[in-house]
Amino acid sequence: MSTSLSAWQSLREHAAKIRHTHMRDWFTGPQGQARSVRLTVEACGLTLDYAKNRVTEDTLSLLFALARQARVCERRDAMFAGEPVNTTERRAALHMALRAHPGDGYRALGVPVEADVSAVLAQMERFARDVRSGSWTGFDGRAITDVVNIGIGGSDLGPRMVCRALEQDTEPGPRLHFVANVDGYDLARTLARLDAATTLVIVCSKTFTTLETMANARTARDWFLRHGVTHSDLARHFVAVSTNRDAVAAFGIDPVNMFPFWDWVGGRFSLWSAVGLSIAVAIGFDRFRQLLDGARAMDRHFAGAPPEQNLPMILGLLDVWYRSFLGTASRCVAPYCEPLDLLPAFLQQLEMESNGKSVQHDGAALEAGSAAVVWGTTGTNGQHAYFQMVHQGSQLVPVDFIACLQPHSDLPGHHTKLLANCFAQGEALLRGRTADEVRAEGKADEALVPHLVFEGNRPSNTLLLQRLDAFHLGALLAMSEHRTFVQGALWNINPFDQWGVELGKMLARPIERELEGAPPQPHDASTAALIRRAAQFCASTD
């Protein structure tokens, strides 16, 4: 149990000692320059400045001691070795093998996986090339112009985010669309813009039974059949990412066009697998390989760099420091990079579904807070929305600023303004503004002074990418995966299962039948009343 470790107890005492120390005091004179240099780490084209955190040398020493006592490095090595680190499902968590090079030698539970991974990548490459070149055609012989990815959770968020992030430099190819929600509006508005004869659907569901995905897939199939596509032609317009060959064939998809993946690939870690088929189609397979290469570079860094120079290790330790010892409830992710506007949502699933747990590996209750709420939007938009709370609110919210050194457009002056605002926000959170400084500015009467004071002492990381391309994005995402793993190891929880999503899905099935007219089942009074109201409304509109 992590909370019983001596380093954990020492960190509790240490947190109480420095809770009211202001970071401004650590940035005066030469010590500030030394701190900035000491608390900056570079790897894989990423630079992390974590100097603006509420940590001293003693804090860091204790955090690294906690990592040793919690055996984080040994747990990491077990994950890379393909051991069953997903303890509740007795599975390996070997997403790193998806971006491996020949000879890296990954094994899942002792079984080599390189040949299987290589075979699927080759299948993906052929498919992406055929679709992008126009040699894959629809039923009437025309090239595919639009590809719709139907999936949810990890089968949607990761590919959607990557395609959005890298779309600016993508060579011409088919347009990509993503449908996830079972709300019919999501699918209807997408299909309304498309020509069935030149549309291809990728259905992503490991079991081919996911409720939302299969409801959308069946509706899409009906749409094709209403728009001139025959049952025998459906195979030209559907492919599947799944492991359920029989269900895929029964749906009408040629099993030859089924792209498999494995039970050692968790959904939120799966964009590197066949789940990333939409990415390969959108950006081309060469750039998909670059995405994998960036992730592999970060894998090697995480596996081999000492903890004090290890990006995922440092970030995971800081996350636990704030959540478990300083009591923060959330973390803001602010990419000052418009193409990364979906990154906060991706990280939200990655961290909160992985570590939103209250029991440890052995089933014992966790005695510390886990999985901070991850949220945010792009800068500078966030400055005009929620940054008021981050600067002057009553709760402490650590911020991750993410920026790219190379601009994303040729418009003069925009990128310098973007970077200036990013760096200024971090400085403002650190420094704050005292009442004396407000008075010295001479712009406010005394009654207004308290409203213009900024406490400061609000922590942030700044992560700089050399440029936003496939390689650096791959490194950034793999770093986030490993950061999440470090959090879980420190809390002694399993970051690779998600039992918490199951109960609601199970309860939805009988409710759906009741809404369709089946006899009422036992529910709490509130839920029963909601079902009656919805059923009565539906009946009155029939």
Curated annotation (Swiss-Prot):
The active site is at E353, H384, K505. It catalyses: alpha-D-glucose 6-phosphate = beta-D-fructose 6-phosphate. InterPro entries: G6P_Isomerase, G6P_Isomerase_C, Phosphoglucose_isomerase_CS, SIS_dom_sf, SIS_PGI_1, SIS_PGI_2. It is an enzyme of class 5 (isomerase). Its EC number is 5.3.1.9. Keywords: Cytoplasm, Gluconeogenesis, Glycolysis, Isomerase. The keyword Ribosomal protein does not apply. The keyword Oxidoreductase does not apply. One of its GO terms (cellular component) is cytosol. GO terms for biological process: gluconeogenesis; glucose 6-phosphate metabolic process; glycolytic process. It is found in: Cytoplasm. Pathway: Carbohydrate biosynthesis; gluconeogenesis; Carbohydrate degradation; glycolysis; D-glyceraldehyde 3-phosphate and glycerone phosphate from D-glucose: step 2/4. GO terms for molecular function: carbohydrate derivative binding; glucose-6-phosphate isomerase activity; monosaccharide binding. It comes from the Bacteria. Catalyzes the reversible isomerization of glucose-6-phosphate to fructose-6-phosphate. Belongs to the GPI family. This is Glucose-6-phosphate isomerase 2. It comes from Cupriavidus pinatubonensis (strain JMP 134 / LMG 1197) (Cupriavidus necator (strain JMP 134)). The gene is pgi2.
